[in-house]
Amino acid sequence: MEHQSDRIRDRAVPFAALVGGNIALALGPWLVRLSDSGPVSAGFWRIALAMPLLVLFARMSGEKLGHMSRATLLAVLGGGLLFGLDVASWHLGIGDTRLANAVLFGNSGSIILMVWSFVVLRRLPMGREWPAIMAALAGSAILLGRSLEISHANLVGDLFCLLAGLLYAGYLLILQDARKALGSWSLLALAGLASAPVLLGLALALGEPVWPTDWTPLLVLAFSSQIVGQGLLVYALRHFPPLVIGIGLLTQPAVGALVGWLVFDEVLLPLDMVGVVLVASALVLARVVTPRVRS
């Protein structure tokens, strides 16, 4: 009986980490809207405020921050640049579109990586890859069309979030080999070190207010997104296959839609729900069928 209890606990803890990590990340757009700095400035503080803890966790885990090859260093710098642009684009989109759309399109990197794999491997989609692509295209068309019906600003917000998904896919591809040489916390810390100046420079160029009057949303954003969300998912990824990770990802649009409805009166009509389900299904399928590719 005790052995069975231990086995249930061994499964429950990683599952709780998977769900908790996705919920923490899904609350990010809400906190960006609550911030009284600019959206790109909020991205800078999200990275900068989390840096000390990321470095501390890397050292506590025995990871070495300063020992890497030139190729790894260049990959980290390039990845950090793309990550900074990803955060900036996503945060700009969050302010204009609905939270459910922002979360879905912001996570579109999985689908983009799947399509990129076809280009690299020089082959057409097969099997379950076709339904993933068709669902992504159909769902995106529905959501983009609905945003255009609401306002042009909503459509622009969607496009910024889609651009963020594209940039995040590039970030993952560039850091593909660096992940072997660096631990998870070290990679997050070094990528953050490279992306923070990018975000600060963009915020200043856009004329955004950088210094907030209320630090609470930014402190919670940095802790929930960079520490709790990323940390829990790093832990959970070791315990589940891609299908379960993909299904866990569906927590994010559900939380985004709920917060959008309760806090910002964002109502999803039945057609919106069809679009959300199609894109969410595509995200799950993309995580299952995407082969590992080398850039």
Tell what function each PLM region has.
Residues 1-44, 78-81, 89, 150-177, ...:
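Glycine-/small-residue-enriched transmembrane alpha-helix faces in small-molecule transporters
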Residues 2, 47, 146, 214, ...:
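C-terminal-most transmembrane helix of multi-pass membrane proteins
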Residues 13-23, 45, 59, 64-89, ...:
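Loop-to-transmembrane-helix transition segments
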Residues 25, 31-33, 54, 113-119, ...:
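Transmembrane alpha-helical segments that form core, pore/gating elements
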Residues 35, 42, 46, 77, ...:
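Hydrophobic/aromatic residues within transmembrane alpha-helices
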Residues 41-52, 91-124, 164, 242-261:
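Specific alpha-helical transmembrane segments that line the substrate/conduction pathway
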Residues 54, 58, 77, 83, ...:
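Hydrophobic transmembrane alpha-helices of multi-pass small-molecule transport proteins
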Residues 102-108, 174-196, 226-262:
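Helix-helix packing/entry segments at the starts of transmembrane helices
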